């Protein structure tokens, strides 16, 4: 597998998603990834630490530059818990749980997050403003309502299908109400 190509595809997709998601400094972005799917395998069966490292490092570098927090979702064996910076967990009053990810419980993305984040911890739940799902890992449970699908121009990283979500405030009040412009659906 060409790791440079995986990094370039990740960078292109992330930039596309960020351009459409209208995130602000301090927002949270969730990343779900299956390195097995990126390499053409079945989710959870063929994890690659190197693939996870390239993807997480690429995403983390871009988000940190913009002041956006990264939350890396783990696999079902950790109940899709997330690796975040301790500072975010404290700021958002998230309950920190005691588990260390492994390649087959948490996955390559979480191992990479523990490697590249300054002070990583695991939390069970978060409410992110947007996210990227590489390999159909089901990130929706961690993105706030109302979720808006984002269709990146590039549809895959390696062999893995890619989807993305942003969010917007709920529209309440019915036909008599007036609303602010929706930055996500401005087209």
Swiss-Prot record:
* Pfam families, per the entry: DUF436
Q: Which family does it belong to?
A: Belongs to the UPF0340 family.
User: NCBIfam families given for it?
Assistant: TIGR01440 family protein
What is this protein's record name?
UPF0340 protein SGO_0411
Q: What species is given as this protein's source?
A: Streptococcus gordonii (strain Challis / ATCC 35105 / BCRC 15272 / CH1 / DL1 / V288)
């Amino acid at each position: 597998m060409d790791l440079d190509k995986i990094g370039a595809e990740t960078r292109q997709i992330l930039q596309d998603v960020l351009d459409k998601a209208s995130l602000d400094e301090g927002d949270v972005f969730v990343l779900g990834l299956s390195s097995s799917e990126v390499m053409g395998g079945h989710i959870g069966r063929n994890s690659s630490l190197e693939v996870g490292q390239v993807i997480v490092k690429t995403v983390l570098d871009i988000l940190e530059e913009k002041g956006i927090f990264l939350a890396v979702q783990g696999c079902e064996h950790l109940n899709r818990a997330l690796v975040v910076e301790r500072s975010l967990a404290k700021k958002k009053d998230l309950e920190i749980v005691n588990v260390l990810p492994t390649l087959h419980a948490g996955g390559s993305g979480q191992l990479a997050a523990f490697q590249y984040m300054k002070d990583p911890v695991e939390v069970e739940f978060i409410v992110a403003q947007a996210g990227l799902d590489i390999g159909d890992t089901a990130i929706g449970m961690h993105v706030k309502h109302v979720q808006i699908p984002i269709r990146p121009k590039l549809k895959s990283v390696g062999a893995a299908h890619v989807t993305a979500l942003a969010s917007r405030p709920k529209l309440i009040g019915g036909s008599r109400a007036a609303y602010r412009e929706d930055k996500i659906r401005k087209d």
